[in-house]
Regions:
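Active-site clefts of carbohydrate-active enzymes
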Residues: 221-226, 259-265
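Catalytic alpha-helical scaffold of carbohydrate-active enzymes acting on polysaccharides/glycoconjugates
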Residues: 1-156, 161-212, 236-257, 264-328
Length: 328
């Protein structure tokens, strides 16, 4: 069902699926495979391959903005109390060891798979301030485990929490990744692109142009807008699909949407069903990152070169990788 390549005449809606936790891998992933497969869609699943230490993330509670997000999205409801104890009151399960069969089932269903991270919380909370040795060691641990699970080397990556550093981007070239999705396009408060021309680009790190094509997320995530007041209306489970579909109406460009196995694959699945139906009705092809890369082949040499940059996004606490204006 997923062997036919997409019709590139249609704009692509790239489904980039971040799988952060043991529970998400065990339960959410299978739901997403069925939902997307039922629509003959394609997608890329990015797996966390080492220990689930989600409980460590509670330290982020000290960060400004964290509590407003938690109260909006009900972390316990979506992640489950047990998951929030991993690494604190309970030992963190080893996702790549315990869920290898679930991961291979995604590949066997015809979906692209790639790396999210080794240890989601460890990476997200540390990589911005760590050096090359720590960074490369973590990435190679994830790559080795991926090869163990799938029997082949990984081909792509999407960073946990959109957190990276220069050494991590350089490691993509060393690993031979042709494309990745590690950052975000800057968004306005209403979810629209601050720079409508943003999209696929290459990065310049420490003055060196890298080969790996970055395909940044162009749309807000559900947890960034759920419960927020935007243009005078509160975004709720009842109207969030319509809100996101307004951002893609007209189907004038390709989009990358990041979803989470723990959200869209579980409690928020009914919203995701509305989005899938809506995007297909708008004329989009539900696509994988590999599909997008294939579509970009003709223009790969003309993509802008942008410096590595940090920034903030509405509805998300802290700094993350964002697309900067192209280098002059």
């Amino acid at each position: 069902l997923t062997e036919t390549l997409p019709n590139h005449a249609k704009p692509l809606l790239v489904l980039k699926i971040d799988v952060d936790t043991y529970r998400g891998t065990r339960e959410g992933v299978g739901h997403l495979v069925r939902m997307i497969g039922a629509r003959q869609g394609r997608a890329t699943f990015l797996f966390s391959l080492g220990p689930d230490h989600t409980g460590w993330a509670l330290r982020r509670a000290l960060r400004p903005g964290f509590f407003s997000k938690v109260s909006r999205t009900s972390v316990v409801e979506h992640y489950g109390l047990k998951t929030l104890m991993y690494g604190t009151l309970l030992p963190g399960p080893d996702i790549g060891k315990d869920c290898a069969a679930e991961m291979r089932a995604v590949r066997d269903a015809g979906f692209e798979c790639g790396i999210h991270t080794w240890d989601h919380v460890l990476w997200q909370d540390n990589v911005a301030r760590r050096g090359a040795d720590w960074t490369v060691k973590m990435m190679r641990k994830a790559a080795a485990r991926y090869a163990q699970v799938f029997g082949v080397a990984p081909r792509t990556h999407g960073a946990a929490g959109w957190q990276m550093n220069g050494a991590a981007f350089i490691e993509h070239d060393t690993a031979g990744y042709a494309y990745a999705s590690d950052g975000r396009c800057v968004l306005k408060e209403n979810g629209t692109l601050a720079n409508p021309a943003d999209g696929p680009h290459r990065l310049s790190v420490a003055g060196k142009a890298l080969k790996c094509i970055q395909m940044p997320t162009t749309l807000p995530t559900l947890d960034e807008v759920l419960g927020c007041e935007i243009d005078g209306s509160t975004i709720t489970a009842a109207n969030i699909a319509a809100f996101l579909l307004r951002l893609t109406e007209g189907a004038t460009r390709d989009h990358v949407y990041t979803l989470h196995a723990e959200l869209e694959g579980q409690k928020l699945a009914p919203i995701f069903e509305q989005l899938l139906a809506g995007w297909q009705a708008q004329g989009y092809q539900l696509a994988s990152m590999a599909d997008y890369h294939a579509k970009l082949a003709a223009v790969a040499d003309t993509l802008p070169l942008c410096p590595m940059t940090w920034g903030e996004l509405p509805g998300r606490s802290g700094q993350l990788m964002v697309q900067a204006p192209a280098a002059a």
